[in-house]
Swiss-Prot record:
GO terms for molecular function: ATP binding; phosphoribosylamine-glycine ligase activity; phosphoribosylformylglycinamidine cyclo-ligase activity. The gene is purM. This is Phosphoribosylformylglycinamidine cyclo-ligase. HAMAP family: AIRS. Signal peptide: none annotated. The keyword Ubl conjugation does not apply.
Length: 346
């Protein structure tokens, strides 16, 4: 053991202990195609073991943003890894890809093996939910860059789709309907605004329970991002999905146009789905306009699929048969961007 390195803030032995603690969680993520074990220089995956004829690899990378600040404040680290996986695999899913494997990057101010295990346990849980093998990663101790209690996490997902089955949105046309899938809450976006409104301006306490919630505010805010992989892949198999969008940073206004061909926009029917209480709670505490809410948050819809009108019932049935709550939330119209109807904006 290097005492000089330890005195400089890097504890190699603690790093070794963290890796030992990770192994049982990584083992949970084994799937067909995964090769090798933890500790190699590169993660391996044998695509030939899967029944693809013309596979196209589709990748995505993302992080969790300032939701981490709440994990630090609550000293709760077992779900933030789920968020890291969800942000990546839901993006890959939006192209119709089956997530295959995942890598994580964890940078810490101080290597605490117990805390690192909690974080990686969450990553492994996200991988299990999405069917991804956790084939590798990096844990870097960076004293001076982060405080001892701080860390950052990012992930990288690789999935595959048949070449003729990639969902690009290019076949969306006027009259297609939009199916929205319920979110679990805030997911992993908008937390800088959340902290400003609820903690700085309103002075609320993360450890207290406020109406209408039945658990402390911090736990409500840390609810992990929903992973949509399994129900959506079942719907994709039908060949009836023309386009998909993962509703993340920028909310409806930024993300729905990303799946639209030029010359088309969407009309969203406000009131066509139940909005989780965390959103009106934030809106009321911050005096925020509805338009701003839809430009920052998912507002209760975390994933959107575009389908032909005649396919809507079958697709919703498939999603609900696989445990997902699905709602008809709007339609595709000539134009651009996102307009809101129904109950309107205030």
């Amino acid at each position: 053991m290097s005492e000089s390195y330890k005195n400089a803030g890097v504890d190699i032995e603690a790093g070794y202990e963290a890796v030992k603690r990770m192994k049982k969680h990584v083992e949970r993520t084994k799937r067909i195609g995964a090769m090798g074990g933890l500790g190699g220089f590169g993660g391996m995956f044998d695509l030939s073991e899967l029944p693809y004829k013309q596979p196209v690899l589709i990748s995505g990378t993302d992080g969790v943003g300032t939701k981490l600040k709440l994990a630090f404040a609550m000293d709760k680290h077992d779900t933030i890894g789920i968020d890291a996986v969800a942000m990546c695999v839901n993006d890959v899913l939006a192209q119709g890809a089956e997530p295959l494997f995942f890598l994580d990057y964890l940078a810490v101010g101080k290597a605490d093996p117990v805390k690192i295990e909690e974080i990686v346990k969450g990553v492994a849980e996200g991988c299990v939910q999405s069917g991804s093998a956790l084939v590798g990663g990096e844990t870097a101790e960076m004293p001076g860059l982060y405080t001892e209690d701080e860390y950052d996490i990012a992930g990288f997902s690789v999935g595959a789709a048949e070449k003729d089955g990639i969902v690009t949105g290019e076949n969306i046309s006027e009259g297609h309907l939009l199916i929205g899938l319920s979110s679990s809450g805030l997911h992993s976006n908008g937390f800088s605004l959340v902290r400003k409104v609820l903690l700085e301006d309103a002075g609320l306490n993360l450890d207290e329970t406020y109406a209408p919630f039945e658990r402390p505010l911090g736990e409500e805010l840390l609810e992990p991002t929903k992973i949509y992989v399994k129900p959506v892949l079942e719907a994709v198999k039908s060949g009836k999905i023309a386009g998909m969008a993962h509703v993340t940073g920028g909310g409806f206004i930024e993300n729905l146009p990303r799946m639209m061909p030029d010359g088309l926009g969407v009309e969203i029917d406000i009131g066509s789905w139940p909005v989780p209480p965390i959103f009106p709670f934030i809106q009321e505490k911050g005096g925020l306009k509805s338009e701003e809410m839809f430009n920052v948050f998912n507002m209760g819809i975390g994933f959107v699929l575009a389908v032909k009108e005649e396919d809507m019932t079958d697709v919703i049935q498939t999603l609900e048969n696989n445990g997902e709550k699905a709602y008809l939330i709007g339609r595709v119209k000539a134009g651009s961007g996102v307009v809101f109807g129904g109950a309107g904006l205030s």
